[in-house]
Curated annotation (Swiss-Prot):
Segments on the Peroxisomal matrix side according to the record's topology features: 1-30, 84-112, 220-246
Gene (UniProt): PEX10
EC assignment: 2.3.2.27
Binding site for Zn(2+) 1: 327, 330, 347, 350
Source organism phylogeny: Eukaryota, Viridiplantae, Streptophyta, Embryophyta, Tracheophyta
Phenotype for residue 350 to G: Embryo lethality
Species, as recorded: Arabidopsis thaliana
Similarity annotation: Belongs to the pex2/pex10/pex12 family.
Alphabetical UniProt keywords: Membrane, Metal-binding, Peroxisome, Peroxisome biogenesis, Protein transport, Transferase, Transmembrane, Transmembrane helix, Transport, Ubl conjugation pathway, Zinc, Zinc-finger
GO biological process: embryo development ending in seed dormancy; fatty acid beta-oxidation; peroxisome organization; peroxisome-chloroplast membrane tethering; photorespiration; protein import into peroxisome matrix; protein monoubiquitination
Pathways per UniProt: Protein modification; protein ubiquitination
Protein origin, superkingdom: Eukaryota
Transmembrane portions of the chain: 31-60, 62-83, 113-154, 179-219, 247-266
Deleted gene: phenotype: Embryo lethality at the heart stage.
EC class of the enzyme, as a word: transferase
Protein name (record): Peroxisome biogenesis factor 10
Length: 381
């Protein structure tokens, strides 16, 4: 007996199951069954994640457990999907909803390579992307503070390149050094632009996820991006009902929402371009007018020059960077500072993890909830 998931439009109906030429044709799983199975899988994976986190906390302490909470989540998800999908078995959610995975044009069971690819997309890729994003943001701050080092390396690197090459070894060394210098400068520019690119990348990712969900509501094949990338579908092997609900109307709503977001994005881009052109025109007129503006005097009556203003700004910037506090839970620089109702500030991930266990402030024990936490942007204390 062989499974066939691509049975055509007429064979996807509930009454199309049966024997035809010795082949048992099962209908494709409907959207409610796939969504229900995904919710069950997330629930059981969270159970394993909590068990791994508790074991890790008892072994190494709360501080180290908070520092490696993302790795514990990755470990829990990997264990769940490797023990189920990786071994060729149904997950608990799939077994609950009577669906199985198929792939390929003939609707056969996924190969081990395809299952491994799905597990990698489902668990490791989001973790790696988040780690790269965090590391890039940290290095962007480090590069801003060490511009002198990169300036010196940029000055000294041409001396290495301009050395006379009298042999093949010197030529290869100069080529390698030139390539290394270009890669370092490209990496430096990319890291410096990352804080600006990150919000745009997140918006694009949200649009891609919504577009995938819209396609799922229309066609009913791939609920997750990982399944679409690996080509894993579902067929229904349970008792067929007379009416299997579909979610095309939700796809229409998502399509309307995406159109509105696209129109809003175009409007914002046009407004930003118009604003930048107006600012450039005003700056140009100010520079060509020859005026230097009104003189500004300090408390002693001396004229404040541009160099003094730059010095004051640099001093204030350095003091502001030094004033950034540390989280009392992880004892490191606060990432995404979040304030509690009582006024204490922690890392977003640290205080959220704390509120999962105890809904109170770690310092003053004031009761608080997840909804009462406020993430502070463009400021820290």
């Amino acid at each position: 007996m062989r499974l066939n998931g691509d049975s055509g439009p007429g064979q996807d109906e509930p009454g199309s199951s049966g024997f035809h030429g010795g082949i048992r044709r099962f209908p494709l799983a409907a959207q409610p069954e796939i969504m229900r199975a995904a919710e069950k899988d997330d629930q059981y994976a969270s159970f394993i994640h909590e068990a791994c986190r508790d074991a890790f906390r008892h072994l190494f302490g709360t501080r180290i457990a908070l520092a490696y909470q993302k790795e514990m989540k990755l470990l829990g998800q990997m264990l769940y999907y490797v023990l189920t999908t990786g071994s060729g078995q149904q997950t608990l959610g799939e077994e609950y909803c009577d669906i199985i995975q198929v792939a390929g044009p003939y609707g056969l069971s996924p190969t081990p390579a395809r299952r491994a690819l799905f597990i990698l997309y489902q668990t490791a890729v989001p973790y790696i992307a988040e780690r790269i994003s965090t590391r890039a943001a940290t290095q962007a701050v480090t590069f801003d503070e060490s511009d002198e080092f990169f300036g010196d390396s940029h000055i000294h690197s041409p001396r290495m390149i301009d050395l006379p090459s009298s042999s093949q070894v010197e030529t290869s060394t100069s080529v390698v050094s030139r390539l290394n210098d270009r890669l370092m400068r490209s990496w430096h520019r990319a890291i410096q632009r990352w804080p600006v690119v990150l919000p745009v990348a997140r918006e694009v990712l949200q649009l891609v996820l919504r577009a995938n969900l819209m396609l799922f509501y229309f066609e009913g094949f791939y609920y997750h991006i990982s399944k679409r990338a690996s080509g894993v579908r579902y067929v229904f092997i349970g008792k067929q009902l007379n009416q299997r609900p579909r979610y095309q109307i939700l796809g229409v709503f998502l399509l309307i929402q995406l159109c509105i977001l696209a129109a809003e994005g175009l409007r914002r881009s046009n407004l930003s371009s118009i604003t930048s052109s107006i600012q450039q025109a005003s700056i140009g007129s100010y520079q060509t007018s020859g005026g230097r503006g009104l003189p500004v005097l300090n408390e002693e009556g001396n004229l404040i020059t541009s160099e003094a203003e730059k010095g004051n700004w640099s001093t204030s910037d350095s003091t502001s960077t030094e004033a950034v506090g540390k989280c009392t839970l992880c004892l490191s620089t606060r990432q995404h500072p979040t304030a509690t109702p009582c006024g204490h500030v922690f890392c977003w991930s640290c205080i959220m993890e704390w509120c999962n266990e105890k809904q109170e402030c770690p310092l003053c024990r004031t009761p608080n909830t997840h909804s009462s936490l406020v993430c502070l942007y463009h400021s820290d204390f």
